[in-house]
């Protein structure tokens, strides 16, 4: 049957100069869907989990640090003056970083033409951008406490240093989520002991990690979920507490603080190191799994809290919305902070299917950095290969 020719196609844009093969639905009405697809909300995770102080004026805040003393027995006739030990004092100072701002300009003509509201969402996004900057700064300061050079890594000698815990395998070997989760749990066991050895209070301990590491912990605990009902909620995919640490999922773990430009890291105030091994850097973007701390490890000083300001820009016929705050962030207690990082050693290669001789198996490459556990595993593999070769030879002779 022949195709119909002619007939009205009202949706097609048939104006002068328009190609006939244009959109056949172009002229039909686009109905507002009733919902604006705004960006997902970003939530600050550090605000309630570290020390925050407010000042009414000035450029910085002082945090005095006191050391410890020791008791000693006093025998008859001895003088206390001969045994006295001075309690050392020092201080930590957090300086206000400056006035951090985010703003948007809404032109009257565009606002009049628009058929949906944008002001509330713009306001939310401005506030979120400042919250993310504060989060990034606090997390970068935790990493900073782990990277301080040895002559400055304690507030007062004897109070303790930051703890950096390596996994027993390197990053390339921990692609399995369950294996990674077990490594993180084992590291948190060591972290718990390290903080307790520094007399850090058991309460208010937090472990910040990215979504991959958070999911890995869940995967490691899931097979025994019934036994860990107090720790995880498999239905919601959430973790409450592991080894005394509140586990917090942070997508922006290594973002760092704000800079002098809206795009990129130009003039960034609190930088999260990019690469391990540069100077004293032990914790960086390329090896960090998570950061742990007590709430007193890092501090924030507020000169002006988060505020919103609306201004009329008559010369542009527009309204301006400004979000701003004046804060400073800094590390306070190295002994109450630490990080879990991937092992920096070279990964063992996959065992060859060709049986090696005992002499060959006993040779360890000077290029490989092996832990005792890896050395034992390699020896067991070599012994197994030797036995299989001997068995195959005996079978062939028969």
UniProtKB/Swiss-Prot annotation:
Keyword NAD: no
Record key words, sorted: Capsid protein, Virion
InterPro entries per record: Capsid_Gp10A/Gp10B-like_dom, Capsid_Gp10A/Gp10B_dom
Subcellular location per the Swiss-Prot or TrEMBL entry: Virion
A GO cellular component annotation in the UniProt record: viral capsid
Residue spans of biased composition, Polar residues class: 362-372
Pfam family for this entry, one: Gp10A-like
Region forming the signal peptide: none
Chain positions covered by the region annotation Disordered: 359-398
Family: Belongs to the T7virus minor capsid protein family.
Stated role: Assembles with the major capsid protein to form an icosahedral capsid with a T=7 symmetry, about 60 nm in diameter, and consisting of 415 capsid proteins. The major and minor capsid proteins are incorporated into the capsid in about a 90/10 ratio respectively. Once the capsid formed, encapsidates one single copy of the viral genome.
Entry-linked HAMAP family: CAPSID_PROTEIN_T7
Miscellaneous comment as given in the Swiss-Prot or TrEMBL entry: The minor capsid protein is produced by a -1 ribosomal frameshift near the C-terminus of the ORF coding for the major capsid protein, producing a protein with a C-terminal extension compared to the major capsid protein. The major capsid protein is produced by conventional translation of the same ORF.
Entry protein name: Minor capsid protein
């Amino acid at each position: 049957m022949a195709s119909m020719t002619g007939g009205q196609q009202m949706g097609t844009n048939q104006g002068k100069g328009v190609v006939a093969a244009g959109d056949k639905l172009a002229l039909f009405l686009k109905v507002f869907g009733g919902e604006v697809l705004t960006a997902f909300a970003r939530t600050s995770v550090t605000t309630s989990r570290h020390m925050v102080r407010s000042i009414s004026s000035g450029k910085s805040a002082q945090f005095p640090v006191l050391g410890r003393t020791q008791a000693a027995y006093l025998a008859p006739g001895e003088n206390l003056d001969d045994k006295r030990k001075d309690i050392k004092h020092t201080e930590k100072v957090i300086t206000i970083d400056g006035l951090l701002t985010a703003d948007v300009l809404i032109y009257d003509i565009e606002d009049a033409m628009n058929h949906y509201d944008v002001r509330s969402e713009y306001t939310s996004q401005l506030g979120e951008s400042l919250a993310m900057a504060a989060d990034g700064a606090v997390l970068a300061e935790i990493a900073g406490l782990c990277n301080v050079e040895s002559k400055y890594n304690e507030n007062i000698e004897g109070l303790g240093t930051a703890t950096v815990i390596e996994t027993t395998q390197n990053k390339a070997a921990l692609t399995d989520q369950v294996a990674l989760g077990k490594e993180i749990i084992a590291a948190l066991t060591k972290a718990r002991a390290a903080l307790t050895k520094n007399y850090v209070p058991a309460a208010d301990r937090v472990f910040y990690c990215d979504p991959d590491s958070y999911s890995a912990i869940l995967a490691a605990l899931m097979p025994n979920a019934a036994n860990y009902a107090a720790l995880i909620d498999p239905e919601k995919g959430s973790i409450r507490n592991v080894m005394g640490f509140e586990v917090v999922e942070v997508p922006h773990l290594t973002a760092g603080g704000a800079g002098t430009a809206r795009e990129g890291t130009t003039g960034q105030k609190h930088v999260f190191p990019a690469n391990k091994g540069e100077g004293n850097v032990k914790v960086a973007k390329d090896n960090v799994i998570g950061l742990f701390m007590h709430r007193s490890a890092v501090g924030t000083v507020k000169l002006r809290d988060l505020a919103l300001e609306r201004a009329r820009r008559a010369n542009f016929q527009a309204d301006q919305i400004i979000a701003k705050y004046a804060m400073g962030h800094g590390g306070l207690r190295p002994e109450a902070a630490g990080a879990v990082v991937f092992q920096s050693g070279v990964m063992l290669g996959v065992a060859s299917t060709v049986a090696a001789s005992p002499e060959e198996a006993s040779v360890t490459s000077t290029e490989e950095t092996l832990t005792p556990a890896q050395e034992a595993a390699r020896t067991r593999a070599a012994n197994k290969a030797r036995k299989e070769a001997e068995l195959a030879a005996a079978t062939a002779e028969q």
